[in-house]
């Protein structure tokens, strides 16, 4: 199904508004979801709206929730998300952090009790657009674990994404590293299961602990587990994310004494800085440009057009989706059913 970006945003806004989400919050969520689809992250795009309906119906997300600063020490801020939509809460927190970097050159910010923050690269792009560098870790609580620790056969962690982003010179797209510490994100597994497509080898184990490519294994009565990317390396980063985001924010970790209500709650730890403070911008730009050209000059492997740096993939996808979105038929059917159940008009092609 091909629809315009305007229609896609309006559909998302209308679906959320029909569930008593305030207009400004619905706008932020809709914009974030559509941008995720444009970037090629369909697992964090419009396809997730049925999950948000479930969360709203179960009172697991606060439709009115807004970020509140509970500790302000100038270059250190702690926010509480009040269980609100992460795409709105996260945007508010990032805007506050960016303003502090403008004042002080750097900022550490934490956020607790946010509903699903969405695509973490979105916040990295916000920082990069302001000319700043971001490094963030996120943990996921209030749900059952879905990622097995290295050497384990059952889940003990969640997908705990990390993000690194910063501006690039000469009009190049920003550098954006946005990765789950699992081999694939849980929402990616959800999309694969919905589309009936196999998961990559080495990304999932079944309930018996054996490898499988059946993504639906993650959503059955006896679910399996995602594996950490890179074995012990991804596992270690997942543990770091759990402690930085879960403990330093005050939001908690996935350990079983904390609630597991069934709907993802995110905690965030982020560092932002102005890269122009220490060294001259001219030298920095020239050095980054030389490094990028060095990467681009790498002879490509068989079947590969060219080597890219992280962030170029998203930028190319966004350029291709400058006016319209191509939505998978199975995902579109789910959106149609959701809209019709809320008496929301469905756009036509």
Swiss-Prot record:
Q: Give the top-level enzyme category.
A: oxidoreductase
UniProt entry tagged with the keyword Lipid biosynthesis: no
Catalytic activity line of the entry: (S)-lactate + NAD(+) = pyruvate + NADH + H(+)
Where does the source fall among the domains of life? Answer: Bacteria
Task: Specify where the region named Disordered lies, as residue ranges.
Answer: 199-219
> Per the annotation, which location comes first and is thus the protein's main one?
cytoplasm
Task: Give the pathway listed in the UniProt entry for this protein.
Answer: Fermentation; pyruvate fermentation to lactate; (S)-lactate from pyruvate: step 1/1
- EC number(s) reported in the record: 1.1.1.27
InterPro entries recorded for this chain? Mal/L-sulf/L-lact_DH-like_ah (IPR043144), Mal/L-sulf/L-lact_DH-like_NADP (IPR043143), Mal/L-sulfo/L-lacto_DH-like_sf (IPR036111), Malate/L-lactate_DH-like (IPR003767)
User: Which family is this sequence assigned to?
Assistant: Belongs to the LDH2/MDH2 oxidoreductase family.
Full protein name: L-lactate dehydrogenase
- Which taxonomic lineage is given here? Bacteria, Pseudomonadati, Pseudomonadota, Betaproteobacteria, Burkholderiales
